[in-house]
């Protein structure tokens, strides 16, 4: 049976092209369209589609308000279309906070010209999030900025510096009521890589960390260049730790999370205790900018076994080769479990390669981190 899709957009051209692209995939079927958020809510309740594609800026009711109403009444996987502007980024993050599962840049030229990459990406995203209808959740609870958070001064100098693994021991899966035990390892860096579903996952984790988190955190989230500054700002307003978009030459400091800028590669240079970030363009042939493998690989060279790393929800296999390098250096690698992932791609690639030691539900990752670093 085909996946039923409701297409929502106030542009007749965009509705028609998105519908044509979706219907070109035999596993998908557009069952109706809506021209504004109010109509989308009504049709979502009546038709109960498997997936909804949603514009943000629409008359009568905007996309964010529609997402909130749909999630409150008939939770459905929603894929947002967003403009590549700072305001568009903020609105998209609001939509994800309200319950949307994923987003795609709204590129009229690519859609109009039927470019293979844009067509395939849209079809794949719809199919991927359709599998998560049972996963649907209420909006993220924490949306109130932390008050009177002490601010530290960040040191920002202007310059700075395959083969499949054999089968490993079974991955440890924590029962719901299990109490975690620290491994006893000492860490100097936490590294987290993610893609689809990552903004919500990172918010859930980072908002639970205290301001005295004992070492730096590097974050690699697949995201367009115009989105990462807005995402870092949002996280910074919600978290006790500091969160910033990484800049070339940043000196890594404890209690600060550095988000890799979209469209760039983030590497670590120097030595433990005096490490700096290098932000570079990277090769055009790289599939992802930023790329989890790139940052993880550089972390392995600098910090070796002193890295606590995690691969969270996301499509594809980015992070697997970086995790392989971390594993060879003796670092700790965790993967998000399948049930709590929006897309079980990246964590699955790491787990199947025998690289992760623990398979954790999203809701307990922060708790596990605090135990592991000696704060719980």
UniProtKB/Swiss-Prot annotation:
Chief location: cytoplasm
Region of interest: Disordered: 138-174
Catalytic-site annotation from UniProt: 195, 222, 318
Catalytic activity: [protein]-L-glutamate 5-O-methyl ester + H2O = L-glutamyl-[protein] + methanol + H(+); L-glutaminyl-[protein] + H2O = L-glutamyl-[protein] + NH4(+)
Cell compartment(s), UniProt: Cytoplasm
Gene Ontology molecular-function annotations: phosphorelay response regulator activity; protein-glutamate methylesterase activity; protein-glutamine glutaminase activity
Chain ranges of the Response regulatory domain: 4-121
Keyword Cell membrane: no
NCBIfam families referenced in this protein's UniProt entry, alphabetically: PRK00742.1 (NF001965)
Protein name: Protein-glutamate methylesterase/protein-glutamine glutaminase 1
Organism name: Vibrio vulnificus (strain CMCP6)
Gene behind this protein: cheB1
